[in-house]
């Protein structure tokens, strides 16, 4: 793709805007609570859009449209599973987690919450969960750096190493400086950009082909299987794709948004906004890939880019169908998707290192100012490690994203779900669930005889372990049960 001045200008303005937001947030960051959770001050709109944007990475504008373009509508099962999982997470977990974390020593991180909720004097829960976060999220961050590098490489013709730093630098800067507020405010802008791109692009593609009926006719003529929801899939394959939705209950970067809401009363409105945004974005991504089939079938001379790599479908359609200024805005949406996810993952890693390890074990009486600066240093450290991992694009980092999603979903998902819904759950139950969930994912990935996504058996076995170990051990203390009951009563409005 040739580099055009409008695209360069658009990208530069967008990146400058994100960094500016970071410096504005810097002025509002007074203590570590502000840096990690924004002082629990997020309203409904910011909570909803930042949760959505931090969830949907470059996969939304590249991976999903590419899969639909290559294989047809059957690849949309994963979008259905994610939508169901996200709604259940908002409905069951979001409000309860917001209240429970405040009642349990104003917990700022998931390991912090687990330690307080289950009265873990040994700090085993805090250490194990912090280590799980660091391992999986460093891999996750590396995948985001690779995706950003690929965008700069293909859009501006940069060599990979230069693109690596260009794609990561702005995200690191505004996360480093502004912390959670910067990440959440930029997520809101980025979510708006993403939904604009994903609604506008498929409409223009359909118009370019000649309308909806003509588009469907061309797709059907190429292969009627493109419209078959079960093309090449059996029951296990469908369940595996739907199973992605289970991952939501255990994703620390999404759960952090719930914890940061200004009140659990904001969650209901945030859920409606967030789910509307998500459905429109996923629907738009599916439509880009689906109707892209019709466009390139009618214009085979323009299909060289997508023939080489189906994941370029959105990039190619933006470049071909829009003037360079609008194309620059649309392509900035891919960068927005990458940056929004990478920034919150960097922050969650930083909080695990600072709150759960540095303050928890090394400097219990550290000042707020010290913790903020240690948090910033940790953002930089994790970012540099992620860039080092991403330096060799052949190391298949992107292929590990589904592994990390399953790892978090199985290790943390059942612990969070039972932890906010069942007062009888104990520390041993939480430990057993976390270990069994993580080990099941690892072993199933290596030795699973059934081609079932490892998050499903991981989630099931972890849930069984939680119930068995909680019921066979000593019940939680009266104080712990009282705190849980008080939080639940507040959530229910009693």
Q: Model features per residue range: what roles?
A:
Residues 1-494:
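Membrane-embedded helix-loop-helix hairpins and adjacent transmembrane boundary segments
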